Amino acid sequence: MASVVPLKEKKLLEVKLGELPSWILMRDFTPSGIAGAFQRGYYRYYNKYVNVKKGSIAGLSMVLAAYVFLNYCRSYKELKHERLRKYH
C-alpha cells in the first residue's frame, strides 16, 4: 500500500493538475516565506554547481551568462534605437 503524502508536503512536479490551485494557496507568501524560498534555491544551486569535490567553471559561468543576458534585456530598448540609426 502506498503512503499518502499530504498536499502541502508535495513537490511541484508531484502535484496533479486538479490539485494545483489548492497547492498554490497553501504556499507561504509572507516576506519571510519568499525570502526562505530564495534562500533554499540559492543553497540548492550552490551545493549542486559550486560546492562540489571536482568543481569546474560551469557553475560560475552560468551565473555570468545569466548576468550578461539580464543586462542585455534591460538595455535592449536603447540598443534597438542605436541599431536603427543610419549615421552614428
UniProtKB/Swiss-Prot annotation:
The modification N6-acetyllysine is found at K16. The modification N-acetylalanine is found at A2. It comes from Bos taurus. The chain crosses the membrane at residues 62-79. Belongs to the ATPase F chain family. This is ATP synthase F(0) complex subunit f, mitochondrial. It is found in: Mitochondrion; Mitochondrion inner membrane. Component of the ATP synthase complex composed at least of ATP5F1A/subunit alpha, ATP5F1B/subunit beta, ATP5MC1/subunit c (homooctomer), MT-ATP6/subunit a, MT-ATP8/subunit 8, ATP5ME/subunit e, ATP5MF/subunit f, ATP5MG/subunit g, ATP5MK/subunit k, ATP5MJ/subunit j, ATP5F1C/subunit gamma, ATP5F1D/subunit delta, ATP5F1E/subunit epsilon, ATP5PF/subunit F6, ATP5PB/subunit b, ATP5PD/subunit d, ATP5PO/subunit OSCP. Keywords: Acetylation, ATP synthesis, CF(0), Hydrogen ion transport, Ion transport, Membrane, Mitochondrion, Mitochondrion inner membrane, Phosphoprotein, Transmembrane, Transmembrane helix, Transport. The modification Phosphoserine is found at S3. Subunit f, of the mitochondrial membrane ATP synthase complex (F(1)F(0) ATP synthase or Complex V) that produces ATP from ADP in the presence of a proton gradient across the membrane which is generated by electron transport complexes of the respiratory chain. ATP synthase complex consist of a soluble F(1) head domain - the catalytic core - and a membrane F(1) domain - the membrane proton channel. These two domains are linked by a central stalk rotating inside the F(1) region and a stationary peripheral stalk. Pfam families: WRW. InterPro entries: F1F0-ATPsyn_F_prd. GO terms for cellular component: mitochondrial inner membrane; mitochondrion; proton-transporting ATP synthase complex. GO terms for biological process: proton motive force-driven mitochondrial ATP synthesis; proton transmembrane transport. It is a single-pass membrane protein. The lineage of its organism: Eukaryota, Metazoa, Chordata, Craniata, Vertebrata.
